[in-house]
Structure formats: C-alpha cells, structure tokens
From Swiss-Prot:
Subcellular location: Cell inner membrane
Name of the featured protein: Phospho-N-acetylmuramoyl-pentapeptide-transferase
Cysteine disulfide links: none
Species classification: Bacteria, Pseudomonadati, Pseudomonadota, Gammaproteobacteria, Vibrionales
HAMAP family linked: MraY
Pathway: Cell wall biogenesis; peptidoglycan biosynthesis
Transmembrane annotation, as ranges: 26-46, 70-90, 94-114, 132-152, 168-188, 199-219, 236-256, 263-283, 288-308, 338-358
InterPro entries: Glycosyl_transferase_4, PNAcMuramoyl-5peptid_Trfase, PNAcMuramoyl-5peptid_Trfase_CS
C-alpha cells in the first residue's frame, strides 16, 4: 500500500525512493510486525483472560502440563493481525504471490479459529470435526493450487527443483496441483502437531521463514538465480517482505509465549503459519528444501504416524507418547531443555537447507 503512495510522492520528495528498495521494506516489515505483536500482546492476553478463553489440557498428557490449564489461548490472532497489517503496508499489492500467501494465511486462520472456538468457548474438547477441518483445508489448498497453476502453467513456476542437482528441474504439469495441495495441507498440520510446548513451534517457524526470505530474494534476482542454477521467478522477490513479516510477528509472539508461556497461539495460529510456510515453499519452488529446513515439523509428524501405525499393526508403541516432544518430557527432560534443543536442531537444518542452494 505504502509503495503506491511512495510512487506518487517520489517526484516531489526524493526520500520516498527508499521504498523502492526491497531491503529497506524488508527491514521495515520485520520491525512493524514485531512492534505490532509487542503492542497487541498485553491487550490480547488481558482480553482472553477476561473472556476466560484458556487452554484445554488432556488428562492423559504429561503431568507437567496440568499447570498450563487455563492459560490464555488463541493468541495466534495477534500473529495473523500483525502479519496481515504489515503485508498490506509494505508489499506491492499488485503481486499475485502476496495474495496467494494471504489467502492461505487467513483462510487457514479461520479454520483454526473455528476449531479453537469450539474447544475453548463451546467446551467441545474435539473442536471442529476432523473431516470438516480437512475439507476446508483441502478446499483452500486446491483453490490456491489451481490458481497458481493457471497463472504459471508450463513455466519455471511449475517446475520441481531437486536439491543438490542443478540440471534436474522436471516440468510437473498437473502434478503441480497435487504437490501444492500436499505441501500446504501437510505443512499446516505439521506445525499444528509441533505446537505442544511453550515456544516450540514459533521459533522453528521464524527460522524457516527467515531461510525462505533468503531463498525468495535469490529466486527473484535474475543474477543470483542464474548463478545458483535455480528458476528465476520475478514475483518471488516480494515474498522477502512477507517472510520478514512472519519473522517479526513470530518474535513478538515469542516474547509472551516463551517458557512459562503467558499465551498460546492455538490452532488459529499454528494452522495458518504452517499453511503460509507451505505456500511460500511452493511459490519459490523449494518444496524439497522445506522438508530439510522444516525438519523439526517433519520429525514431529513422522513420530505420530509411526506411533499410530505401530500400535494398530503390532499393538505396541514406539514412543512413550507422540508427538515426540512428549516422549522426551516423559523421559525426564525439563520442558525448556526439549524446547531449546529442538530450536538448535531447527537452526542447523535451516542452514543446511540454505547450503543446498550452492551445493549442486
């Protein structure tokens, strides 16, 4: 929005030329989102407490979690508000990639909101019925996938980039739609599964978003994309501002979500952030790098799949409890130790993911 205003005022005030620079808008984006989150945090927490919107804790969960019962939840609303306002302020709103991310972010946020509302306000522990949750997730993902396919059909925007191989970029055709669907829905639910400890999901989300900011910048730059042997996608550069908005809003939320948490993001936050990360990965054609950088999310999801599969097939559990962060809690690890070690793993994986751009 402001970039349009800057274009109008440039002939009269040269200062507004600064807003043409992607790096300048990226810095303003992270600072704006961070400031909004820090400002909204106390207001949101107080409001949630007044409305008695508190976390529901399963009786079969770790005993250490019983103290979390009643902690304000649905704090993801302030994350989405901070990201959305920042995007509307600092991005080029004529860019279709920006609207693709916003559609998934707010659409999945709405699904998560209904789920949280039913759990916390209506006191329905099951929340939104699973089949309806997946229906709305699938509908949003397919709409975005079809739109992106129609927009970039048979171009670099629908190629599959394989890490470590510079000349392996097959054209996906209609398989692009299927891949996009699974990446968006899968990442959304993976982040949701990871959101089980204070700050556990938000920091890896921030790190992955920061990694994708670097990738989006390289993908949207003709010289660097050619140098790194990745597709040149001119619209991708604007995703740098989107990614930095996620980083800023996430860090602001972490201020209140760090152990011991004053607020939880709820499904309204985790489903939306995961969906946004998946969409960004698709747009910059780095779905496979997402598997590396988002390895913590993958690990959490696989632990649930393996646990359920093993119990149904063999009648035995592999882990003491799934997702895997609960396994380590039940082994006696203090919650902060689990959280920080998962953060460290995430940081290393993001660096490895970025290294794949050069190691080809």
């Amino acid at each position: 929005m402001i970039i349009w205003l800057a274009e109008l005022l440039q002939p009269y005030l040269s200062f507004f030329r600064l807003f043409e620079y992607l790096s300048f808008r990226a810095i303003l984006s992270v600072l704006t989102a961070l400031g909004l989150s820090l400002w909204m945090g106390p207001i949101m927490i107080k409001r949630l407490q007044m409305l008695q919107i508190g976390q529901v804790v399963r009786n079969e969960g770790p005993e250490s979690h019983f103290s979390k019962r009643g902690t304000p939840t649905m704090g993801g609303i302030m994350i989405l508000a901070a990201i959305s306002i920042t995007i509307l302020l600092w991005t080029d709103l004529s860019n279709p990639y920006v609207w693709a991310v916003l559609t998934v972010l707010l659409g999945y946020g709405a699904v998560g909101f209904v789920d949280d509302y039913r759990k916390v306000v209506r006191k329905n522990t099951d929340g939104l019925i699973a089949r309806w949750k997946y229906f709305w997730q699938s509908l949003i993902a397919f709409v975005v996938a079809f739109a992106l396919y129609a927009y970039g059909k048979d171009t670099a925007a629908t190629q599959l980039v394989v890490p470590f191989f510079k000349d392996v970029m097959p054209q996906l055709g209609l398989m692009y739609i299927i891949l996009t669907y699974f990446v968006i829905v899968g990442t959304s639910n993976a982040v949701n599964l990871t959101d089980g400890l204070d700050g556990l999901a938000i920091m890896p989300t921030v790190l992955v978003a920061a990694g994708f900011a670097v990738i989006a910048w390289a993908t949207g730059n003709v010289n660097f994309s050619e140098y790194l042997h990745i597709p040149y996608l001119p619209h991708a550069s604007e995703l740098v501002v989107v990614c930095t908005a996620i980083v800023g809003a996430g860090l602001g939320f972490l201020w209140f979500n760090t152990y011991p948490a004053q607020v939880f993001m709820g499904d309204v936050g985790s489903l939306a952030l995961g969906g946004a990360l998946g969409t960004i990965a698709v747009l910059v054609r780095q779905e496979l790098v997402l598997v590396i950088m988002g390895g913590v999310f993958v690990m959490e999801t696989l632990s649930v799949i393996l646990q359920v599969g093993s119990y149904k097939l063999r009648g035995q559990r592999i882990f003491r409890m799934a997702p895997i962060h609960h396994h380590y809690e039940l082994k006696g690890w203090p919650e902060p130790r689990v959280i920080v070690r998962f953060w460290i793993i995430s940081m290393v994986l993001v660096l490895i993911g970025l290294a794949t751009l050069k190691v080809r």
